Amino acid sequence: MAHKKGVGSSRNGRDSDGQRLGCKKFGGEHVKAGNIIYRQHGTKIHPGNNVGLGKDYTLFALIEGVVKFERLGRDRKKVSVYPAS
């Protein structure tokens, strides 16, 4: 017989916070140089014109302009920033 009640499951009680990944600026939105457009793990979305790729795969604007999401071939996506006309 056990001398203590089954308290157990102390290995379960944790729930880590989300990492806030995803789209920060949407298509058609105006951005300034340096604004973060997309946070991701790996190149879910590739950098297009006037968009930089950080070491953690963050996509950011290199110039001031308007965000545009585009296709890159059949099964890839890219995001570009075009100067506002």
UniProtKB/Swiss-Prot annotation:
Q: Where is this region: Disordered?
A: 1-24
GO cellular component entries = cytosolic large ribosomal subunit
A GO MF term: structural constituent of ribosome
- Tell me if Ribonucleoprotein is a UniProt keyword of this record: yes
- Which region is the signal sequence? none
The superkingdom of the source organism is Bacteria
Keywords for the protein's UniProt record, in alphabetical order? Ribonucleoprotein, Ribosomal protein
UniProt-listed GO biological process terms: translation
- NCBIfam families under this entry? L27
Q: Which family does it belong to?
A: Belongs to the bacterial ribosomal protein bL27 family.
Q: Which HAMAP family match?
A: Ribosomal_bL27
Q: What is this protein called?
A: Large ribosomal subunit protein bL27
Q: Which organism is it from?
A: Geotalea daltonii (strain DSM 22248 / JCM 15807 / FRC-32)
Gene name for this UniProt entry: rpmA
